[in-house]
Amino acid sequence: MARSALLNVMVQAVFKAGKSLARDFGEVQNLQVSLKGPADYVSQADRKAERIIREELMKARPTYGFLGEEGEEIKGTDGAHRWIVDPLDGTTNFLHGIPHFAISVALERQGEIVGAVVFNPATDELYTAERGGGAFLNDRRLRVGARKALSDAVIGTGTPHLGRGNHGKYLVELRHVMGEVAGIRRMGSASLDLAYVAAGRFDGFWERDLAAWDMAAGLLLIREAGGWSTDAEGGGKPLEAGSIVCGNEHIAKALREVIQRPIPSK
């Protein structure tokens, strides 16, 4: 596959940060037996990865803005472009030695996502997409799953964790979805879960209370793999709403209808 100069910049940045995270992940696995625990070490690894990515991207395109999970937003001087970065999506998995985490980098141009990279350093799976150019896993072209019936579908999701609200609402949605689908998976890394939708591994996905860096790259991967996405309320703007429902068009629309069912009266 041929990549543009901008996509190559993104790929090289995530590869460099990925080498750092892979080394740190090996150390975290060794720290699992420590009573002190690896939490502080993981926080340092997260910040270090973002610093590497920011330096690489800003070196290549110094006029672009930068929005990352770990630091304050940098406003770009060109006013049109912005990098959107999650240096370690799946921190809890990383902390516990579970190899399901990713680096997510998206390029936004005048409000539209035009480039995407999601990379899992533990598996060397690199997901890339450019607007109008398709989505790829390493060098393999991606297509979303073809299943049309929820009863045949495996659906990914994310659960509200400690410190977040909406637990009750989520449990109602989960109960509704459980009654309609073949299976539900909660993997713990939204950007990688969205990449799984693009690859056809998940037939669909939904989650609320997400930040832009959780979704930006995954949204383009899904679109370029022939998928469809909206927010949980059906407004069509996941990044603004902070929620997402996605899959192929049949699955995503059916899934959104299910999660919109009213809360049953007691």
From Swiss-Prot:
<feature type="binding site">
    <location>
        <position position="185"/>
    </location>
    <ligand>
        <name>substrate</name>
    </ligand>
</feature>
<dbReference type="GO" id="GO:0046854">
    <property type="term" value="P:phosphatidylinositol phosphate biosynthetic process"/>
</dbReference>
<feature type="binding site">
    <location>
        <position position="69"/>
    </location>
    <ligand>
        <name>Mg(2+) 1</name>
    </ligand>
</feature>
<comment type="similarity">
    <text>Belongs to the inositol monophosphatase superfamily.</text>
</comment>
<keyword id="KW-0460">Magnesium</keyword>
<feature type="binding site">
    <location>
        <position position="88"/>
    </location>
    <ligand>
        <name>Mg(2+) 1</name>
    </ligand>
</feature>
<dbReference type="GO" id="GO:0046872">
    <property type="term" value="F:metal ion binding"/>
</dbReference>
<feature type="binding site">
    <location>
        <position position="86"/>
    </location>
    <ligand>
        <name>Mg(2+) 1</name>
    </ligand>
</feature>
<feature type="binding site">
    <location>
        <position position="69"/>
    </location>
    <ligand>
        <name>substrate</name>
    </ligand>
</feature>
<dbReference type="Pfam" id="PF00459">
    <property type="entry name" value="Inositol_P"/>
</dbReference>
<feature type="binding site">
    <location>
        <position position="89"/>
    </location>
    <ligand>
        <name>Mg(2+) 2</name>
    </ligand>
</feature>
<feature type="binding site">
    <location>
        <position position="214"/>
    </location>
    <ligand>
        <name>substrate</name>
    </ligand>
</feature>
<dbReference type="InterPro" id="IPR020550">
    <property type="entry name" value="Inositol_monophosphatase_CS"/>
</dbReference>
<dbReference type="InterPro" id="IPR000760">
    <property type="entry name" value="Inositol_monophosphatase-like"/>
</dbReference>
<dbReference type="InterPro" id="IPR033942">
    <property type="entry name" value="IMPase"/>
</dbReference>
<feature type="binding site">
    <location>
        <begin position="88"/>
        <end position="91"/>
    </location>
    <ligand>
        <name>substrate</name>
    </ligand>
</feature>
<dbReference type="InterPro" id="IPR020583">
    <property type="entry name" value="Inositol_monoP_metal-BS"/>
</dbReference>
<protein>
    <recommendedName>
        <fullName>Inositol-1-monophosphatase</fullName>
        <ecNumber>3.1.3.25</ecNumber>
    </recommendedName>
</protein>
<dbReference type="GO" id="GO:0006020">
    <property type="term" value="P:inositol metabolic process"/>
</dbReference>
<dbReference type="GO" id="GO:0007165">
    <property type="term" value="P:signal transduction"/>
</dbReference>
<keyword id="KW-0378">Hydrolase</keyword>
<dbReference type="GO" id="GO:0008934">
    <property type="term" value="F:inositol monophosphate 1-phosphatase activity"/>
</dbReference>
<keyword id="KW-0479">Metal-binding</keyword>
<feature type="binding site">
    <location>
        <position position="86"/>
    </location>
    <ligand>
        <name>Mg(2+) 2</name>
    </ligand>
</feature>
<feature type="binding site">
    <location>
        <position position="214"/>
    </location>
    <ligand>
        <name>Mg(2+) 2</name>
    </ligand>
</feature>
<dbReference type="InterPro" id="IPR022337">
    <property type="entry name" value="Inositol_monophosphatase_SuhB"/>
</dbReference>
